[in-house]
Amino acid sequence: MCRRDGAFRAYLMQDLELFGYTTCEGCPGGNVEYAPEEMKNNGATVIHLATGLVVGYPPCPHLDHFRRFIPEKYGIPVVVGTHPIPQKYLLTHERLGTWNGPEWPELIAPTLADERTRLAYD
């Protein structure tokens, strides 16, 4: 976050403050129902869903639901991703064809950094 890598590069010229972080609490993501409200009450203006939800094997099956549910229930925008996708994950998902569907370019775009950055996150 401090280096503005990955999805945080959208805030290059802004001050950032971390208001909290949590796990999803495992499938089906019970924390997603409550944690955004607490973060919003503490001053968060955007919720970032972890890059791990995208790069996992397989990616989180509830990701699309989470990114629609949070803004609908709490009125706070959601960005998919935090840190850059590591190179080794990108290569594996390319070989597996995981991100070949039409929804994936938009989902991975915020965290798809240049190769040098991806390698630094390996």
Segment roles from a protein language model:
Residues 1-39, 59-62, 76, 84, ...:
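Conserved mixed alpha/beta catalytic, RNA-binding, or beta-rich assembly cores of soluble enzyme
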Residues 52, 83-85:
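Short, ordered loop/turn segments at secondary-structure junctions
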